[in-house]
Amino acid sequence: MSRVANSPVTLPSGVDLTLNGQTVVVKGGKGSLEFNIHTSVQVSKEENVITFAARDGAKQSRALAGTTRALVNNMVVGVSQGFEKRLFLQGVGYRAALKGNVLNLSLGFSHPVDYELPEGVTAECASQTEIVIRGIDKQAVGQVAAEVRGFRPPEPYKGKGVRYSDEVIRRKEAKKK
C-alpha cells in the first residue's frame, strides 16, 4: 500500500499556502490555485511544511489523504514552475497555428479544426508541427493536450496523427496477400 500522505510537502521560497477551513489557496509567482479538501482529511501547516493525515483510520480516508497530498503538491509545483505538454503532428499537410486564444489545426479532414483554449492554459506553436501547452494547473494542461490529441490520435500503420512528445507508437505491419 502506498504511503504518499506520510511524506510532507515543502513550500519553496516565493510560494504561499493559506488554509481557510477546508479550502487550500496556493499563491506563487505564476498565479494562484484553490482546492477544497474532503472533510475526512486533516491538513496542518508549520512554517513552510504541510502535512496530511486521515481523520480516522478508514481505508477511504487514508486514500483521500494521499490523493490530497499529491494534488496540493501539484498545485505548489504549478504556481512555482508550471507544467507543459508537447504535442507533435505527424502526417502530410498536418499543421497547427495559433490565432489569439484559438488553436487552428489542419489534420487531414475536409475542414480545419478550431480549438479554443480554456482560461489558465496557453499554447505556443514552436513550429507548424509542434504544439507546446503550458499552464499552472496540471489537470487542465493534461486535459487540453488529451483533447487536442483526440482530434486525430496516432494510427498504428503509418504513425500519422497527433502524439505526445514522449509517446511511442507501436507500429503494425500491413496485411499481405
Swiss-Prot record:
Keywords: Ribonucleoprotein, Ribosomal protein, RNA-binding, rRNA-binding. Disulfide bonds: none annotated. InterPro entries: Ribosomal_uL6-like, Ribosomal_uL6-like_a/b-dom_sf, Ribosomal_uL6_a/b-dom, Ribosomal_uL6_bac-type, Ribosomal_uL6_CS. GO terms for molecular function: rRNA binding; structural constituent of ribosome. PROSITE patterns: RIBOSOMAL_L6_1. The keyword Coiled coil does not apply. One of its GO terms (cellular component) is cytosolic large ribosomal subunit. One of its GO terms (biological process) is cytoplasmic translation. PANTHER family: 60S/50S RIBOSOMAL PROTEIN L6/L9, LARGE RIBOSOMAL SUBUNIT PROTEIN UL6M. Belongs to the universal ribosomal protein uL6 family. Part of the 50S ribosomal subunit. NCBIfam families: L6_bact. This is Large ribosomal subunit protein uL6. It comes from Marinomonas sp. (strain MWYL1). The gene is rplF.
